Amino acid sequence: MGAVAIPTRTPVIHPTAFIAPGAVVLGDVTLGPRSSVWYQAVLRGDMAPIVVGEVTNLQDATIVHVDEGKPALIGARVGVGHRVILHACIVEDECLIGMGSILLNDVRIGTGSVVAAGAVVPEGMQVPPGSLVMGVPARVARHVDAGLRARIRGTWEHYVAEAERHRRGAFPLERPTL
């Protein structure tokens, strides 16, 4: 479906951003340079803005939604894993949000933090910069070390390259040999 305007709200898509076929970007959504929205992801900015920073990726089946007067702000160089729900929250720069995690209203994830796969970050939680958050409900487990920081960087670098490959339609078509 791609980018969809609604009355008084039209997506602003940087020319270098990638929106995969089947993804929906609706309403007051801004996608920064070299950001990517992957297959079956939905960004629904119908009640407040959604802003996605440069080089940020929203992987397959991710949902980003807002509440009346409560935007979703996703910083630069952020990796958002498959099937994540981001609801009216703020994710600062250089974070990694693990697959299947859920961030509820008024959550703020500090710069350089990691949310572990499957974590549920409760409404209003303020995560300090450089934290590893995990569990249901989520709690700060420890500080992000150099290895995790490298993983964050590797994720967004990989998705910038993948977006270019998908834009060109450059897929390996050989069947694996068993």
Q: Across the structure, where does each feature detected by a protein language model lie?
A:
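Glycine-rich hexapeptide-repeat left-handed beta-helix
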Residues: 1-12, 46-62, 66-74, 81-178
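N-terminal first-folded block
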Residues: 6-11, 15-51, 67-69
